[in-house]
Amino acid sequence: MIVRGGIEPGSFRVSLTHLPRRPGNMWEADLEFVAPPELEVGMAKVAPASKMPAQIRIESVLDGVLVNLDFDFEVEAECARCLEPVMWTDHSRVTELFLYEETDSRGRVVQACDDASEELTFFYVQDDAVDLLDSVRDAIVLDLPLSPLCRPDCLGICPQCGDKLEGAPHEHAT
């Protein structure tokens, strides 16, 4: 069952039951997702179970629905130079076409066997809903930095003693 403005609690599935299948129809809403677990790249990760406010626009097109999703997410990381914790809010955008599955004259789903399309990945409308999890994961992974910095001019730590090089002069006896 899909509730709360078209979104299933605890998932990224959005119901399309309120959107007529006629091309040109549109549905817009403000939603809130919960960040999926274990979403990280290098030294940065999405804060586990954090709220992800989003604005969604779903447009009915001839072969499916076009989804435009803008969302914010909280990032937790360590500076790649000084290893201090760093947190910020990032923004991402997803635009994805979800196709309707082909059906026969009785409304049963037809399984297409096209060897040429094996390399392509399509997203499909399933049970009058779209699942945005894979698209959101892809967008976040592309947005997270591999080597986050607390500041662009961070000096890092001393390679000999491990102290931060910020602030007071730093010297070692030779």
Protein language model features and the residues they cover:
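Structured interface patches
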Residues: M1-T174
